[in-house]
């Protein structure tokens, strides 16, 4: 192999209802990436038990994510859609990466600090090792690119650190087995087995905020359902949530600079821009000077027109669980085949008998 074959990997946790932020920040980007890339999209159910071990309906949540992928336009025939626990090689490589990674690296992860809170001693070991499993998810396929939000950027940097340490520690074994690719890290040439993964960050609305508090990210775990637009919400519910969305008393500005220190206004304008594939400046050129009583109905109509086809197809798919299960099963078979190719070579590189 002279170079790493380009491959996109990403995953979504099956925890709670998917919402507009998940769609605009992740799933819509997945759909666009599949046009010109080889893609693997995963329902990361092993990650879902790191913070909450017992789920009321984990199978239903897994199917819901898969349905959202497909309803949004991801093609499970051309690309791979599967659930993580169906491919045991993820967990196998994660254990190896637990031995590669340093405890100090894990302790620096801000997401662990945020999720563990003040009671760090009571957090699960799985939550601490979450980034190691994420690295395995990506590298078990030797993926080269990962679409991520800002909140996962640090984890992706850790993935690169783990890959680099493995490559350097086992460089002679990799070279001897004829498995690697010659790359340059910094100014240092190395013979690498795992690629230096690149993040794909951006898009018009990578961070959609709560409809009730523009300083907080839209979240599945927010106790108020009015804080988010769920992908399964019907048109009337979407209209109600946008009508009740928190705003300020001032009119919309005519320029984007006027949104500074107005988080709720900036959030709603950003959502409109993302749904319409326009810039905030273009949206404000149309609505600047108008009150939210005019803007909110326009935003609601746009949201309904974009999301209703997805919602309808999700409902249809969720009514045929056998079809979703068949897609996940076939995707799992294809993913296992690729993952086992990697793990066979990793075992050889490390020196495990097979």
Swiss-Prot record:
ATP binds at residues 13-15, 21-22, 149-151, 208, 217-221. The keyword Nucleotide-binding applies. It catalyses: tRNA(Trp) + L-tryptophan + ATP = L-tryptophyl-tRNA(Trp) + AMP + diphosphate + H(+). One of its GO terms (biological process) is tryptophanyl-tRNA aminoacylation. PROSITE patterns: AA_TRNA_LIGASE_I (PS00178). One of its GO terms (cellular component) is cytosol. The keyword Aminoacyl-tRNA synthetase applies. Its EC number is 6.1.1.2. A motif ('HIGH' region) lies at residues 14-22. Catalyzes the attachment of tryptophan to tRNA(Trp). This is Tryptophan--tRNA ligase. It comes from Rhizobium meliloti (strain 1021) (Ensifer meliloti).
